[in-house]
């Protein structure tokens, strides 16, 4: 999800998506540990998506407009 798409969401929607992505990340790490992970780059994608969403929420709290 692109940053501009994230900025169009409400804070509550972003927090819901972050929670879902954290669950997915947990499952991906579990699959990695058991050797069942087919696409290891998905872990990086999910981590970066979480970071983007948290950045947008933090920008809103501080009051930075982009």
From Swiss-Prot:
The keyword Ribonucleoprotein applies. Pfam families: Ribosomal_L29. Keywords: Ribonucleoprotein, Ribosomal protein. One of its GO terms (cellular component) is cytosolic large ribosomal subunit. The keyword Acetylation does not apply. CDD domains: Ribosomal_L29_HIP (cd00427). GO terms for molecular function: structural constituent of ribosome. It comes from the Bacteria. NCBIfam families: L29. This is Large ribosomal subunit protein uL29. It comes from Bacillus mycoides (strain KBAB4).
């Amino acid at each position: 999800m692109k940053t501009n798409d994230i900025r169009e969401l409400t804070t509550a929607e972003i927090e819901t998506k972050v929670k879902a992505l954290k669950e997915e990340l947990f499952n991906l790490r579990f699959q990695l540990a058991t050797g069942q992970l087919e696409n290891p780059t998905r872990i990086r994608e999910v981590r970066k998506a979480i970071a983007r969403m948290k950045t947008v929420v933090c920008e809103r709290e501080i009051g930075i407009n982009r």
